[in-house]
Amino acid sequence: MFELTGRKALVTGASGGIGEAIARVLHAQGAIVGLHGTRVEKLETLAAELGDRVKLFPANLSNRDEVKALGQKAEADLEGVDILVNNAGITKDGLFVRMSDADWDTVLEVNLTAVFRLTRELTHPMMRRRHGRIINITSVVGVTGNPGQTNYCASKAGMIGFSKSLAQEIATRNITVNCVAPGFIESAMTDKLNDKQKEAIMAAIPTRRMGTSVEVASAVAYLASNEAAYVTGQTIHVNGGLAMI
């Protein structure tokens, strides 16, 4: 199940957390994996651990020219990208009434506009080959909202609308477009929470635990596989029941 041998995947934001887990899981399923990120040393460490079938593609997603070059280089070096995982994202949290234009623009540029640009770059060759899997990592807050994150929530909600629209445009070319929406996932950020904060979070989650990055990555592996050929325009929520959507 979920066999990906010979498929070529590009994973953005692969230098840690969920992105790293996605890269590891896709590689374990047999894919050739392109690792994108800005922390080159971390990418090199991950590549060394994975061994063969790995290529590195460092780039700044807030730079229009670098995004275009990333798509072109990945397509050339991987000899065709079959699977695109738009995972990279940033936050610039703050109350809406105090949010600066820069904080809004920066988050939307990386989390949404770069997704548009990179996906556009790689969709054309996918259409020519009549095969592709585009998987966008959004968030539960893209559906529920979250105070202090109007910019981030807007970017993640935008990804969902983007994915549904694109899915309808290119379905006849055997290209699927889907989202995976994580909830609270164990990470370096959640490790910094104190016990009281963690208890408050757990109380809101029916499973009474946080998810793991591997659980998110497993949903990505499914959507990337042939088994998900009839699934498009959908959002898989990996949140332990925090939001039953």
Swiss-Prot record:
Which sites bind NAD(+)?
11-35
Which InterPro entries does this UniProt record tie to the protein? Answer: 3oxo_ACP_reduc (IPR011284), NAD(P)-bd_dom_sf (IPR036291), Sc_DH/Rdtase_CS (IPR020904), SDR (IPR050259), SDR_fam (IPR002347)
Which superkingdom heads the taxonomic lineage of this protein's source? Bacteria
Give one GO term, molecular function aspect. Answer: NAD binding
Q: Where does substrate bind?
A: 139
Which keywords appear in this protein's UniProt record, sorted alphabetically?
Answer: NAD, Nodulation, Oxidoreductase
Signal peptide (residue range): none
Residues annotated as the enzyme's active site: 152 (proton acceptor)
Q: Name one GO biological process term.
A: fatty acid biosynthetic process
The family note in this entry says: Belongs to the short-chain dehydrogenases/reductases (SDR) family.
Q: Briefly, what is this protein's role?
A: Proposed to modify Nod factor fatty acyl chain.
Query: What name goes with this protein?
Result: Nodulation protein G
Gene name of the encoded protein:
nodG
